[in-house]
């Protein structure tokens, strides 16, 4: 089956004695080789514990019409869903802990336990997370871009040994849209405030996919901010952008209009390629608070 976007392979069985350490990979392509054929992105070898965090989704909820540059904000809420997998063949119990911190202040933290059978996957959900006087994230020109540090830890319930942990910076914001009944056009709101979208187009940082560093991303995304733009449309014919791109957009207050691959030319023989690509893309960056619109190319 064709694979687009990220690719992860479990290698525990294959790298165990006496199996071969060679991995033949065949790329079937019915058209000429293009710039993203083959391995171009980073490759990782991950050593896991008895269990691991597969992915997670943090969803802030900011009600009402908020005012930027205000020191006292009404409380916000959030939900967090964490996918956990037991990698052992036996039943085990695990503790899932998360903390949400702004600078040195802990905004929220909770712990819950889960018991999984051997090889089982399940999701842990934290609902109604209260965030007092939240520091709200705003698009460029409309306000500031404060970020919270979200940390998730997975430990063995018996030994309390750390099995896995993940962290990322997240923004507290609410994005919505509707159709203007007078003009028939779509209008966007951030934290209840209507936003005039001023956007640019992003084909890619480098056609040869070299030097995809945070510094370079910040340089070019920063140019968009200096021009007063607050949105970038990521062209669907490019690559699945690296995390550094979204980090730069976080920093400069740039919303992202994310297009999907293979939506303009669907001649493949496989089933429902657009739906599969949509799922893979959203799993890659499920917590990017600046992603405000998905679309086909």
Predicted regions and their residues:
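Structural recognition of the beta-strand scaffold that forms the well-ordered cores
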Residues: 196-199, 231-234, 255-258, 292-296
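Secreted/periplasmic carbohydrate-active enzymes, especially glycoside hydrolases
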Residues: 1-232, 240, 251
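Alpha-helical scaffolding within the catalytic cores
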Residues: 179-186, 242-244, 273-286
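Secondary-structure transition/capping motifs at alpha-helix termini
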Residues: 157-160, 251-256, 284-289
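Acidic/aromatic-lined carbohydrate-recognition and catalytic surfaces
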Residues: 138-147, 255-257, 262-265, 284
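Aromatic-lined substrate-binding rim segments of carbohydrate-active enzymes
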Residues: 221-275
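Active-site groove signature of glycoside hydrolases
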Residues: 281-297
